[in-house]
């Protein structure tokens, strides 16, 4: 099915990471073009090579630290310039955090890591991509987490950053609606390399967590999360904004 995204320019932060790689493949199937940003060049360049090899995609890459506003502005403007001043979709995927620490075990540095790499980075990318998104009547897809919605123990800084992203996204959906910019939030549970390593280390805990998912598995970055993102960026979702989409196999259900 043609989702109407051929030749659309998609900016993805954390573009070399595992979840991003799946999302990129989903958009590449639709004929999209890419601006990839990341603080780590290795994974990003590997993603570029994969997209060019497997799909013939046009890919522009640039190193940027999302917590530094000047670097974000430079990356956004350079990417847009490469594609003749165009950005159609912004996907804020990048996030780092300390995990497994109780609230009182967190240092300020631990908290800063989550907030700066997630909340501030999302803010900076949205702020500087806005003129291009306004011109294209584009879409923003921001990543949050069930960690904040469900109050998961050991994830206070991560949850704080992600809930901040959700709140900011809803405000942007209200403010940018008159510009025909859609802003939505995705909360995924995805099988990643880190999760596979955890399964090897603690198989019993892994099985316990998987059994808490009604559909009985972790999501696939391309087929599950990526396809939801494709929908949210497509004309089919033109009347969807300010919403949080739980891509968690039913584990995100709340009364």
Residue ranges and their predicted role:
Residues 126, 161, 169:
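Active-site helix of classical SDR
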Residues 177, 182, 240-242:
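Short, small/polar-rich loop/turn modules that mediate ligand/substrate recognition or access, typified
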Residues 100, 150, 211, 229, ...:
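Short C-terminal tail/terminal secondary-structure segment
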Residues 101-103, 107-115, 209:
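Substrate-binding pocket helix/loop in short-chain dehydrogenase/reductase
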Residues 3-35:
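Canonical Rossmann dinucleotide-binding motif of NAD(H)/NADP(H)-dependent dehydrogenases/reductases
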Residues 145:
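Residue(s) in the substrate-gating loop at a strand-loop-helix junction
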Residues 104, 204-223:
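Catalytic Tyr-x(3-8)-Lys segment
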